[in-house]
Structures are given as structure tokens and as C-alpha cells.
Amino acid sequence: MCRCSADSSPVDVKDILNRLKSLSAAEEFFEALGVPYDPKVLDVSRLHIMKRMGQYLAAEDFSHLPDRVIAARARAILERAYCDFATSAPLSHRVFKVLKDHNPNRPVTPGRTVVPLDSFLKPFEKK
């Protein structure tokens, strides 16, 4: 279960968007926004969480909002993105194009040839 924002740390809201833009590590985002996290979840899903956070942020309009409101929304968005992956496997969300395009339940497209790897290795097998 995800932790709620009541468990979070205080946040320095001054110029929060510019500060977020300068961050690179997922842990830095969690620290800057005061969002608690489980390192095990972040180790497995960090790219997915950050990608999802970016998708959620892109849908927001922060123009003309005070920094405290922007910080609160960014914190809520990061919590939401984290919770998406804290309770289910990253593959189930398919946030990256390569995962969206690959559906293991879909049959092979007609006209595409699948060559098993074994067929390449047979000439190299020791006799």
C-alpha cells in the first residue's frame, strides 16, 4: 500500500519547477517534494515512475499559480505515479513505447517471419 502525504517531509516550495528541472536522480525528486518511498520499489520501477510523473505533469497547467500550489500538485503527481507502480508490476502499465508496441498475447503479424535462435546456433554446435 502506498504511503499518504501525511507521512511526507516539509518542502521548500520556492521556485519549485525550476528546481525540479535541474534534478536527475529519482531519489532527488522524492527528496525535493518530500515524498516517502520504498527503495525496493524505486530500484525496480524508477524509470517507469519518472516517465509516468512526466506524463501527469505534462497534463497540468501551472501558469500563474503560486509556488506552494505548484509544489503541492507536483507532490501529489509524484505520489500518484509512485503508487501506480508500488502496487503492480511495471510491465502491466506499459508506459514506454517499446512495451506498448509489444503485446505478448497478440499473435505474430502475418508476413513477419520468426526465426528461432536455435536455428542460428546449430551450425556452431560441437559434434
UniProtKB/Swiss-Prot annotation:
The keyword Membrane does not apply. It holds the Pfam family NifW. One of its GO terms (biological process) is nitrogen fixation. Keywords: Nitrogen fixation, Plasmid. Belongs to the NifW family. HAMAP family: NifW. May protect the nitrogenase Fe-Mo protein from oxidative damage. Homotrimer; associates with NifD. This is Nitrogenase-stabilizing/protective protein NifW. It comes from Rhizobium etli (strain ATCC 51251 / DSM 11541 / JCM 21823 / NBRC 15573 / CFN 42).
